[in-house]
Amino acid sequence: MSKQQPTQFINPETPGYVGFANLPNQVHRKSVKKGFEFTLMVVGESGLGKSTLINSLFLTDLYPERVIPGAAEKIERTVQIEASTVEIEERGVKLRLTVVDTPGYGDAINCRDCFKTIISYIDEQFERYLHDESGLNRRHIIDNRVHCCFYFISPFGHGLKPLDVAFMKAIHNKVNIVPVIAKADTLTLKERERLKKRILDEIEEHNIKIYHLPDAESDEDEDFKEQTRLLKASIPFSVVGSNQLIEAKGKKVRGRLYPWGVVEVENPEHNDFLKLRTMLITHMQDLQEVTQDLHYENFRSERLKRGGRKVENEDMNKDQILLEKEAELRRMQEMIARMQAQMQMQMQGGDGDGGALGHHV
């Protein structure tokens, strides 16, 4: 009789090993198979290089170059919402990236109501998610909530404009704000540092809540702790974007060519582009968690306080029609039941009369 081989479910080499240590691998495989979803909103005046920066960040032509509107167009220019979704795959990991652009923001002569459209869009995505979450098919919910907002600040001023302050205060309880100084190549290093400090002071002065990177855990390696410290010290990020490849020091780099030299997009000594991209990639999960646990929960609690979830007009009409049909059906069933009862009583009465007459005869 041959000796029976141990099955693959038995691990005699490591007695006492249950297998819980493999759970992170299961979560990783499931997440990679499902893919990730992320929505990024970009807000800022025309001409600050928003489209170029987004294309540079994700190495894709997500946005065409826009034409800066003329003075006549700016008189009554309205804010639009343009959402573009692209599937990005890198080493087997899929990312469904949605970038929400806001052309027209800050371009009109009167900007008093220019950000109402943006706030309405953010609330609509919360509303849609709440509606889907409360429905029957909860396994296939598409998350279009805005997880992060890059707010572009002009480098040509001396800090925040009144519009910047008003807009950020209007959305800071709805979305994670990451302030970005655009076109950093127009500033010297000293000017850049002064502008950063001025913006941070004004953000604190006006009690604006921007996204704060979480502290590194105590068990993280020293390199990650140092990276987190540098990222925090770089806020607001001063960036340069470019989709052009130029030759610098014998190699091809993305950058901008000037008479006095080359500004390299991915050179940390020239600007904070790499730091901004690193922050977005390494903290993408945290941005989603803050959106879910803080901003969405605030919206959901407020909605429930006001009497439950808001139902769209179309759904409300459908529900109303169904209720009316059900009420009509119940009335018909009750009427049929009464008619059947009357017929039953008449039949019983007829049988009694017939029996008496037969007995009398």
Curated annotation (Swiss-Prot):
Residue positions, PTM Phosphoserine: 218
One record GO biological process: spermatogenesis
Chain positions found as Phosphotyrosine: 17, 211
Spans annotated as G3 motif: 101-104
Reported tissue expression: Widely expressed. Up-regulated in liver cancer.
Keywords, comma-separated and alphabetical: Acetylation, Cell cycle, Cell division, Cell membrane, Cell projection, Centromere, Chromosome, Cilium, Cytoplasm, Cytoskeleton, Differentiation, Flagellum, GTP-binding, Kinetochore, Membrane, Mitosis, Nucleotide-binding, Phosphoprotein, Spermatogenesis
Region (Important for dimerization): 260-270
Positions of modified residues (N6-acetyllysine): 190
Pfam families on file: Septin (PF00735)
Sequence segments annotated as region (G1 motif): 44-51
Miscellaneous note of the record: Coordinated expression with SEPTIN6 and SEPTIN7.
Subunit structure and binding partners: Septins polymerize into heterooligomeric protein complexes that form filaments, and associate with cellular membranes, actin filaments and microtubules. GTPase activity is required for filament formation. Filaments are assembled from asymmetrical heterotrimers, composed of SEPTIN2, SEPTIN6 and SEPTIN7 that associate head-to-head to form a hexameric unit. Interaction between SEPTIN2 and SEPTIN7 seems indirect. Interacts with SEPTIN5. Interaction with SEPTIN4 not detected. Interacts with SEPTIN9.
Protein name: Septin-2
Gene that this polypeptide is encoded by: SEPTIN2
